[in-house]
């Protein structure tokens, strides 16, 4: 079954928020118009309608459209009122149905603020936490951070709806919490958690481990790219004493230090030095820890950056009810479909343009044969 057909099946389980009296348009049709128009460059409800009207004959090949193309008000109202948790569940089920994650896959968890989606009278913009499969380049799921809370409470909820068995979960220092580590282990996965000043006692104990330990495994890598040379040294300790006194971190087996030095070849910029620390339930070689930790930044470069540059997410002004969260899911469905299409060797922006121009290529992105 194609990704698009599986998407239709999953969408059929979504609760329709509308009254069943005098419905003119099918929920499935509205949702698929949203997905396809976003793939092809639409950024507003009005643009979705304009695109769908210009491609009505194309849409009729796989949609019912009993009363033609829905209006802008209808599309706005539907995406604003769909329960965002229900939509997030559908999204996660769809990803699970079209992908098989390899054992030991690194899944990065990180948050992003949708800066344009700030409602009048609200203190802050909407903040989403997403899960990114680093090797497969797929968004696995997302969850909204409650306005009166933070990522610490949202991350366990996201982990519970994902299938993370045998995966390695990487999270920045915000997620370095004992309950989060326990949730990961309870779901048969492993963790690599960044440690900073928010866990001051733990950080001090890790400093002591590297100060006094005589059994440290190291791996050094050197990369030259974009006019700079970066040297990284990954140091690993598995036989530690000081950290054990810090409390019960579930299945904690390894402490890690990454020292990086960045030198600029043709610039007056000074050399940049940084040291970062991590705890992990994994028992890997130093080289594998270095690789896993580096891959975490794929969620910044391949997801957050692409959503901003390729989809212009930060400029979105969708504020009504659940519109911002649900539109964010649309973007991630579109991103996954575009990344899943491997024949076109260009960036997301270029793929979106081609999908809008070329119906044959759009069918390829959707995995449809009509």
Give the label of every model feature segment:
Residues 190-195:
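Short hydrophobic alpha-helical runs that function as membrane-insertion/retention elements
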